[in-house]
From Swiss-Prot:
Residues the record lists as N-acetylserine modifications: S2
Keywords, sorted A to Z: Acetylation, DNA-directed RNA polymerase, Nucleus, Transcription
UniProt-annotated location(s): Nucleus
Similarity comment text for this entry: Belongs to the eukaryotic RPB4 RNA polymerase subunit family.
Job of this protein: DNA-dependent RNA polymerase catalyzes the transcription of DNA into RNA using the four ribonucleoside triphosphates as substrates. Second largest component of RNA polymerase II which synthesizes mRNA precursors and many functional non-coding RNAs. Proposed to contribute to the polymerase catalytic activity and forms the polymerase active center together with the largest subunit. Pol II is the central component of the basal RNA polymerase II transcription machinery. It is composed of mobile elements that move relative to each other.
Matches recorded under InterPro entries: HRDC-like_sf, RNA_pol_Rpb4/RPC9_core, Rpb4-like, Rpb4/RPC9, Rpb4/RPC9_sf
Record organism: Arabidopsis thaliana
Protein's name according to its UniProt entry: DNA-directed RNA polymerase II subunit 4
PANTHER family: DNA-DIRECTED RNA POLYMERASE II
Example GO molecular function: nucleotide binding
Top-level division of the source organism's lineage: Eukaryota
The organism's taxonomic lineage, starting at the top: Eukaryota, Viridiplantae, Streptophyta, Embryophyta, Tracheophyta
Gene Ontology process terms (BP): DNA-templated transcription initiation; transcription by RNA polymerase II
Length: 138
């Protein structure tokens, strides 16, 4: 990203390093950290000695703000959002915040309505309905 152009997440001007990065939703990070914590419990008599304060706080945060807890639901959410040609950034914002209406989704991720993209209101509504089904049956 050139020094002249300001970063703006609403327009997906977030820098090349972020556009190319693989993003994880809170629920995905939660699964990874929980798995690591379980591994530490198995190899240590006192697993809390093996866990840093940063690890513990990070795990608490992602558990608290994860909208999906079941590993199958987490997989389904990523699959649903991936079908809609979203960037990783958009996918994670929608997966973390779980908007319920098209208006909420566009307010949270204005780039959904960028010219030339195939995200009309009906497509966004279908995506949100699919996500709500996953949440309902989790």
């Amino acid at each position: 990203m050139s020094g002249e152009e300001e970063e703006n997440a609403a327009e997906l001007k977030i820098g090349d390093e972020f556009l190319k990065a693989k993003c994880l939703m809170n629920c995905e990070v939660s699964l990874i950290l929980e798995h690591k914590f379980e591994q530490l419990q198995q190899i240590s008599e006192d697993p809390m000695n093996q866990v840093s304060q940063v690890f513990e706080k990070s795990l608490q945060y992602v558990k608290r703000f994860s909208r999906y807890k079941n590993p199958d639901a987490v997989r389904q959410v990523r699959e649903i959002l991936s079908r809609h040609q979203l960037t990783e950034f958009e996918l994670c914002v929608l997966g973390n915040l779980c908007p319920e209406t098209v208006e909420e989704a566009v307010a949270m991720v204005p780039s959904l309505k960028t010219k030339g993209r195939a995200h009309d209101d009906e497509a966004i509504e279908k995506m949100l309905n699919d996500l709500s089904l996953v949440k309902r049956f989790e």
